[in-house]
From Swiss-Prot:
Identification of the protein by name: Alanine racemase
Modified residues (N6-(pyridoxal phosphate)lysine): 35
Native source species: Legionella pneumophila subsp. pneumophila (strain Philadelphia 1 / ATCC 33152 / DSM 7513)
Species lineage: Bacteria, Pseudomonadati, Pseudomonadota, Gammaproteobacteria, Legionellales
Family, similarity comment: Belongs to the alanine racemase family.
Record SMART domains: Ala_racemase_C (SM01005)
Length: 357
């Protein structure tokens, strides 16, 4: 036996969401973003399912790409933050990893580091996010340097990133899209701008390649829509079980600080999951979990290893019953809203002690 706190990853949901993406972006190449351990869903679980069904995996760094290769997955990988030192270039080219170039230092490393094979590159341009990327007026010089470098593959791509795509009404979105579309420098063989939110809201931004992240895992990129609204299915189910049940007298205080009590006798269930597992500590009152086909409210403070739920009106629920913290029935978007954060953060903050099943 082991602690019941676990993640259940649904391959069929992942494939459904990929199908939805391809329906929204017909004929477009797909880079599946699997950085940060596939948004917490587990790259070991996700990458083999998607292998051969997409054009590339998007990762943040060399280490993440090597972890995918170690799984025996053959789909190409793209390092979205590029290399962090010139030494990484030889490892990247030996493993056929493509690199994003987003600043002059990376370009200099590439030009001054002879490589045994041509390396595939994408150039990132800053169209308004002001985080990574060359300025538009620098692109001509960048392209010139790449075209004359004999160890650069000439299938060079151009990409940018939208700062406000999750807020489709913001004028900055169309401004960035227009700036990107107006770039007419020859030599760029493929272009990419659309993340999850843009795939849905800005079909004209899909260009040659789309880059789904959060929607691939069945979570909405928008604050006012959830997965079901978008025809997506949650890939991650964060599960645990009830480890204890106590019958308490009226006005018994529950948990740290005694922040919750009832003016009548109560029945309190203890669930083996807490903020040490990645469940948010700061949630609003009556945030639900799913037990035996219904929602049950969390009461009291979430502690490191446990949380407590009110079973007063649910006498049939027993020790050992499964609890869905978020997933198919209680969408992670609801928990994120309750915690004052976003689904991205909750998926990515699952701790190492939570096992995958």
């Amino acid at each position: 036996m082991s602690r019941p706190t676990r993640l259940v990853i649904e391959p069929s949901a992942l494939l459904h969401n990929l199908s939805q993406i391809k329906h929204l972006a017909p004929g477009k190449k797909v880079i599946a973003m699997v950085k940060a351990n596939a948004y917490g869903c587990g790259v070991r679980e996700v990458a083999p399912v998607l292998d051969g069904r997409i054009e590339a995996f998007g990762v943040a760094c060399l280490e993440e790409a090597l972890a995918i290769r170690a799984l025996g997955v053959e789909t190409p990988c793209i390092l979205f933050q590029g290399v962090f030192s010139s030494d990484e270039l030889s490892v990247a080219v030996e493993n056929d990893f493509a690199c994003v170039l987003h600043h002059a230092q990376q370009l200099e490393w590439l030009i001054k580091t002879p490589l045994p094979y041509p390396i595939k590159v994408w150039v990132k341009v800053n169209t308004g996010m002001h985080r990574l990327g060359f300025k538009i007026h620098e692109l001509q010089k960048v392209m010139g340097a790449l075209q004359t470098c004999t160890w650069v593959d000439k299938s060079i791509g151009l990409m940018t990133h939208l700062a406000c795509a999750d807020e489709p009404h913001r004028p900055e979105n169309q401004q960035q899209i227009s700036l990107f579309q107006e770039i007419s420098i020859p030599g760029f063989r493929q272009r990419s701008i659309a993340n999850s939110a843009a795939i849905i809201s800005f079909p004209d931004s899909q260009a040659d390649v789309v880059r789904p992240g959060i929607m691939l895992y069945g979570v909405s990129p928008f604050a006012n829509q959830n997965a079901h609204d978008l025809g997506l299915i949650p890939v991650m189910r964060f599960m645990s079980a009830i480890s204890a049940i106590h019958d308490n007298p009226s006005f018994a205080q529950v948990g740290y600080g005694g922040t919750w009590k009832s003016d009548k006798p109560s029945r309190i269930g203890v669930v083996a999951a807490g903020y040490g597992d990645g469940y948010p500590r700061h949630i609003s009152e009556k945030t639900p979990v799913w037990v035996r086909g219904r929602e049950v409210s969390i009461v009291g403070r979430v502690s490191m290893d446990m949380l407590t739920i009110d079973l007063t009106e649910h006498p049939d629920i027993e020790i050992g019953d499964e609890v869905e913290l978020w997933g198919t029935h209680v969408l992670v978007e609801r928990i994120a809203k309750s915690a004052g954060t976003v689904g991205y953060e909750l998926l990515c903050q699952i701790s190492e002690r939570v096992r995958y099943k």
